[in-house]
Amino acid sequence: MARKTNTRKRRVKKNIESGIAHIRSTFNNTIVMITDTHGNALAWSSAGSLGFKGSRKSTPFAAQMAAESAAKSAQEHGLKTLEVTVKGPGSGREAAIRALQAAGLEVTAIKDVTPVPHNGCRPPKRRRV
């Protein structure tokens, strides 16, 4: 029986002009995912995946680095224009949007899609530090 050779599939370079950047900014981390207009992922990055650990993940600088990293790999697919959707209350929201613009991508629209409960679940108790 012939041995199966280990061949990895190469990433196909797609020619996509416009896409959507989904920025999820929590109190602990910032995740930036860039998709095409149908929602298929092109690139993603997060503060934790770039090596930031602990409380450094939640900083605006970490969010900026995550957005730059995702933008760089999305530009390899030919991406030029972006719509941005921002979700969550974290500190890296504005920094990530600015980093996408600084990376050379044209931001056409910014939407805030943070889920707001209509008095659903009881929130966690307040921290006393």
Curated annotation (Swiss-Prot):
GO molecular function, one term: rRNA binding
Gene3D superfamilies for this protein: Ribosomal protein S11 (3.30.420.80)
Pfam hit, one: Ribosomal_S11
UniProt keyword list: Ribonucleoprotein, Ribosomal protein, RNA-binding, rRNA-binding
InterPro entries referenced in this protein's UniProt entry, alphabetically: Ribosomal_uS11, Ribosomal_uS11_bac-type, Ribosomal_uS11_CS, Ribosomal_uS11_sf
Entry annotated with the keyword Nucleus: no
Superkingdom of origin: Bacteria
Keyword Ribonucleoprotein: yes
A cellular-component GO term for this protein: ribonucleoprotein complex
Annotated SUPFAM superfamilies: Translational machinery components
Example GO BP: translation
Coiled coil ranges: none
UniProt subunit comment: Part of the 30S ribosomal subunit. Interacts with proteins S7 and S18. Binds to IF-3.
NCBIfam families, per database record: PRK05309.1, uS11_bact
Record function comment: Located on the platform of the 30S subunit, it bridges several disparate RNA helices of the 16S rRNA. Forms part of the Shine-Dalgarno cleft in the 70S ribosome.
Family matches, as PANTHER family: 40S RIBOSOMAL PROTEIN S14/30S RIBOSOMAL PROTEIN S11 (PTHR11759)
Family: Belongs to the universal ribosomal protein uS11 family.
Entry protein name: Small ribosomal subunit protein uS11
Species, as recorded: Listeria welshimeri serovar 6b (strain ATCC 35897 / DSM 20650 / CCUG 15529 / CIP 8149 / NCTC 11857 / SLCC 5334 / V8)
Organism phylogeny: Bacteria, Bacillati, Bacillota, Bacilli, Bacillales
